[in-house]
Amino acid sequence: MQTIPIKHVGNDPLVDAFQRRYYYLRLSITDVCNFRCNYCLPNGYQPESNKPSFLTLNEIRLVVKSFANMGTEKVRITGGEPTLRKDFLPIVETIAQNPTIKQIALTTNGYRMAKDVAAWKEAGITSINVSIDSLDARMFHRITGIDKFEDVMRGLERAFEVGYQKIKVNSVLMRDLNDADFNQFLTWIKDKPIQMRFIELMQTGEMDHFFQQHHVSGQLLADKLINAGWTLQSKGLLDGPAKVFKHPDYVGEVGLIMPYEKNFCASCNRLRVSAKGKLHLCLFGEEGITLRDLLQSDDQQLQLQARISSALQGKREHHFLHQGDSGVRANLASIGG
C-alpha cells in the first residue's frame, strides 16, 4: 500500500507542478463488468480473492466531498460497469447532494439503459457516455462478447425520450474489426444530437499483441475529418480529453481521443480514484496512492485533502505511451479507462 508524506502545497490544492488545474474526477465504483470487450476484458471479469471490497456509499460521499472542497466541479462515474452496483442510484443521489458538483456524468455499456435511464436522470446523472463499438449487430457481438446490440440501441433512444439533449457514444476503432464503420458512424449522426467519440486503441500490459495487430492512428481519422470539411472546436473548462469537430451539415459532432498525440497531456484536467480507494494521477503509470484510510470519518477531511494535494505535485508532465511504455496498467477496467 503506497502512501506519501504530506508537504505544503500552497493555496491551489488542485494545481500540479506544471500549473495544470484539476476540476474533473473520474470515480470508479466497481471493477465488475458484464461485457467481455476484446480490447479490455476479453476473458470477462475475473474476481480477485482476498482483495479489498469496493468503496462504500459513505466512503464515496467522503472522497467526493474532499475533491469538491478542493475545487472539483465534475464527477464521472465509471467502472467496470457502474450500473451493476445495487446501490448505484443512492451513489448518484449522494454525489448530487454536494452543491459544488455541477456535472455528474456516467460511462456505461448501456446494458441497463432502456429500463433504468429515467431513474438515472431523476437521481442526478446530467450526461451519459455509452459504448457502441459497431453499428453492425454481429460485429458488436464479436467485439463485446455479448449479443445485446438491439438492447443498447433501444436504451439510446430511451435516453433521448426521457430528456437528455445530447448523448456521447464511445467507439474504439480497430483495424480489421470495426475501422470500416467510420463512415457509417458519420452517416448515423448526421441528423442526431450525438457526439460520436472515436477512441484510439491503447496499449496495456495484457493486450500488447492485440494492440500491435489492431491499432489505428487517431491522426488518420483527424485528417479524414478535416479533409471532409469538419472543423476543430475549442475546449471548455470541464471538457474531457476529446478533440471535438463540427460540420455545418451535421447535427452530430465527432470527438477524437488520441493519447499518442504530441502534447495530449498538456491540457489534462482530471484525476482518477479507483473502486478500491486509490488515487491515480494518470491512466498510465503509477500503482496508485491509497486514500481509503482517510475515508472513514468527516473528521479526516483536512488530512485527506492534504494527501491529495501533496500527491498531485508528483504527477508527471506526460505519459510515455509514445515510447511503448504503458506503465503498470494490466487493463483499463480497474480504474475506469
Swiss-Prot record:
Q: What does this protein do?
A: Catalyzes the cyclization of GTP to (8S)-3',8-cyclo-7,8-dihydroguanosine 5'-triphosphate.
Under SMART domains, the record lists: Elp3
* Matching SUPFAM superfamilies: Radical SAM enzymes (SSF102114)
Instruction: Report which reactions are catalysed by this protein.
Output: GTP + AH2 + S-adenosyl-L-methionine = (8S)-3',8-cyclo-7,8-dihydroguanosine 5'-triphosphate + 5'-deoxyadenosine + L-methionine + A + H(+)
Cofactor(s) needed for function: [4Fe-4S] cluster
Could you give a single Gene Ontology term from the biological process aspect? Mo-molybdopterin cofactor biosynthetic process
Where on this chain does GTP bind? R26, R76, T107, K168, R270, L271, R272
Family membership: Belongs to the radical SAM superfamily. MoaA family.
Does the keyword Iron feature in the UniProt annotation?
yes
Q: What is this protein called?
A: GTP 3',8-cyclase
Q: How does it assemble?
A: Monomer and homodimer.
Q: Which gene encodes it?
A: moaA
Could you list this entry's UniProt keywords, alphabetically sorted.
4Fe-4S, GTP-binding, Iron, Iron-sulfur, Lyase, Metal-binding, Molybdenum cofactor biosynthesis, Nucleotide-binding, S-adenosyl-L-methionine
**Known EC number:** 4.1.99.22
| Start and end residues of each Radical SAM core domain | 17-242
The record's Pfam families line, in alphabetical order, gives: Fer4_12, Mob_synth_C, Radical_SAM
Q: Name one GO molecular function term.
A: S-adenosyl-L-methionine binding
Q: Which domain of life is it from?
A: Bacteria
Amino acids binding [4Fe-4S] cluster 2: C265, C268, C282
Q: In which pathway does it act?
A: Cofactor biosynthesis; molybdopterin biosynthesis
The UniProt note on the cofactor reads as follows: Binds 2 [4Fe-4S] clusters. Binds 1 [4Fe-4S] cluster coordinated with 3 cysteines and an exchangeable S-adenosyl-L-methionine and 1 [4Fe-4S] cluster coordinated with 3 cysteines and the GTP-derived substrate.
**InterPro entries from the xrefs?**
Aldolase_TIM, Elp3/MiaA/NifB-like_rSAM, MoaA, MoaA_NifB_PqqE_Fe-S-bd_CS, MoaA_twitch, MoCo_biosynth_MoaA/MoaC, rSAM
Where, by residue number, does S-adenosyl-L-methionine bind?
Y39, G80, S131, M202
Which amino acid positions bind [4Fe-4S] cluster 1, per UniProt? C33, C37, C40
